Amino acid sequence: MVKMLVLYYSAYGHMEQMAKAAAEGAREGGAEITLKRVPELVPEEVAKASHYKIDQEAPIATPGELADYDAIIIGTATRYGMMASQMKNFLDQTGGLWAKGALINKVGSVMVSTATQYGGAELALISTQWQMQHHGMIIVPLSYAYREQMGNDVVRGGAPYGMTTTADGDGSRQPSAQELDGARFQGRRVAEITAKLHG
């Protein structure tokens, strides 16, 4: 059975919802799932004052455990068109894994959330994939296999590189049913492709 980690950073809970949906989809695809988050770097008093969602139930991951999985889906909030510093800080601690080639031929996939539709989602998706590529991971994108990302009738998440959601500047917009469905699709797709590669 494929062992998959869904690893995320979420300040306000949007990516937490997407990560849970991706985990559901991966389970449907036959994977054994672990859902974890990266440590918060913002001081607790600042996080509380900024109304961060600090009661997230997922346990905190450690960089060394990434080698234990066949596939890793990273979900991250974005800051100025890049992954959030919390996720970058976590990935910057994986140099030991890189030196050992511990993630070579593992499967990787990425999802992001942004404040606006044009808030750098595609750049954040691709630049997070770069981190995985430096580790020798095999990238499995959302791709246009997920057809529900097409159309302009409503705000829709998704890009060929990975699933996206938009939160609005004040965080008031929650992931839509379509976006959660896309996250489930991506999780299932990663699980099924990983099973073919590692089965």
From Swiss-Prot:
Cofactor(s) required for function per UniProt: FMN
EC number: 1.6.5.2
PROSITE patterns recorded: FLAVODOXIN_LIKE
Enzyme class: oxidoreductase
Domain of life of the native organism: Bacteria
Domain annotation Flavodoxin-like: ranges: 4-190
InterPro entries (UniProt xref): Flavodoxin/NO_synth (IPR008254), Flavoprotein-like_sf (IPR029039), Flavoprotein_WrbA-like (IPR010089), FMN_Rdtase-like_dom (IPR005025), NQO (IPR037513)
Catalyses which reaction(s): a quinone + NADH + H(+) = a quinol + NAD(+); a quinone + NADPH + H(+) = a quinol + NADP(+)
Record's compositionally biased regions (Polar residues): 163-177
Pfam families associated with the record: FMN_red
Family to which the UniProt record says this protein belongs: Belongs to the WrbA family.
Protein's UniProt name: NAD(P)H dehydrogenase (quinone)
Organism the protein comes from: Brucella suis (strain ATCC 23445 / NCTC 10510)
